[in-house]
Structures are given as structure tokens and as C-alpha cells.
Amino acid sequence: MSENQNLILNRKDTGRYLMKIKLYSAPVISLKENAIIDSVLLKMQLNNIRTVLITSEKKPRGIVTETDIVKFLEDDKTNRALDEIPVTEIMKEKVISITDEQQDHLNQCSQRMEIFKIGSIIITDEDGVARGITTKTDITSAFSVMYQGKCKVKDYMSKNVVTCRKSDSIQYALNMINKNGISRLIVTDQFGNPTGLITRNTFLRYANNIKKSSKKALDYWNPTDLDIALPIEKLLDQDVLVLNLEDDLAEAAKLMVKNLVGGIPVINNERKLVGIVTKSDVVRAFSEVESNSQLLEKYKQTH
């Protein structure tokens, strides 16, 4: 483990050790540029990850996300087998990275995630060799420890929430995600109360489970007529978490990390759905709070 991989937090009042915060995961899960989509899917499933780095001579060549694969499977009409499709056909060639010697690591990563609207930053050594990856989960985990009591959920949540009812079909839910360009969909009961959360990964796992014998991209992704008719509640595998408007954003971040979820619905005092807070919102909060802290520190040093 690199000595740069963790940040030691000390209590400001006593100077005593408080907690070690992971700056990035290492080694980064990767495949060579001659890989196929089938291999990428397998890597994601085996390692429970949403991003795979594509390398050439151990240096970043491109990056593939869960969203990239979902969009490709929806759009590809060639009827090719998954082991016939090269990863270079779907990967993004622009890889955003910083070196493992970078000062202010978490802030640098959160700022880049915000600017480029991405979910991960690749960490390299001074020679450009990939060493690790910092994800929104890492930033969210750090925020839960570093900024307790600093922000409220209501200040960073998204108020425009896209929903579907649990009785709606699987196909309808998928269409809602695609139409609105979102990563997750809140599922409600007939009264509009949140009962679950569906993500792109939910559909990937479902497609994999029902199409084990098929290797065609078209068959892998497109459900049969019977599957289309199934209600979305069939894919809900856990009770939904909820947050209140006045909850501490750091506690919300801790809940996301602990429960392996990327977003949590927000309700008001009448238990009505009023928004959703996601890891992306936490990343935004981190970048703002950290930047403000640095500005304040510089002000103190000059006045």
C-alpha cells in the first residue's frame, strides 16, 4: 500500500490520531485495450464496480463505465455477440487523472468530478503508470468523517425527482431512465410514497440473470415480451432508505457508503417525497466546503 494512499486526520484540539481516510483504491481494476465487452461486464460483476480502466503498457488508454455499457447495449443493432465487440468501441478515450503526489488530493478529485461530470479519477505515478482510482464513494466516505454538522440534506438535494410506480412495467422504468438521462429512478406506491430505488446496474444484473445462455448483445439487453410485462417491483430487493430535509449531509453520506447505494430519497414532515440526495451531491458539497475552508485559511494567514 502506498504511503500516499491514506490521509491521517487528527483532532485539532488535541492533535491526537482520529481516523485514517482512504484517498484512493489500489490497484485499479483494469483490462488491456484488446479486451472485449464480455470481459468488461465480467470484471464489473466479479468486483462489484462500475468503472473499468483500459490500459496500454500499464498507462491509461481509456475508461468504461456501467452507463457506457448500458447505452451501447440499447443502441447497438448489429446482432453481434458480446465477445465480438471490442472495448475500444465504447470506451471514453479522455481519462481524467492526477498523480499520487498531488497535494490536497480529495479536493482536487472532487473539483474535477464536478467540472467534468464524472464519477472517478485515475491516480498515476510520475511516469503516468496507473496506480489507483478515486471514486465518488471515496469522496462520500471522506465527507462523512470530515464534515459532520457542516451541511444539511435540504441544501444539496435535487428537487426534480423522476419516479415510477411499483406497478409500472420493467420496460417503462427503463424508458424513464433513458428518456431523462438519469442513473436512478425512485419507485413509489399508489400514494406517491417511496418504496424502492432502481438504477442502471439493476437492469444490468437483471439482464445477466435472465439471459445467461445468450451472448448476443441484442438478446442480452432486450427483454422478452413476458419480461416487459413484469412490474418493476419484481426487481426491488431491499427496503428503501429515506432522509429528512433537516438531516446532516454527513450522516446521509455515511448511510450511502454503509448500504452500498448511490442515492437516497428525501421526505418532508408529512412523509411526502420532496427530493433525492446522491453521491454526486455530496461530491459537490465536498468541493464547495473544502474550497471555502482553504480560502478561509489563506485569509487568516494574510490578516
Spans of model-derived segments:
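Tandem CBS (Cystathionine beta-synthase) repeat/Bateman regulatory domains
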Residues: M1-H303
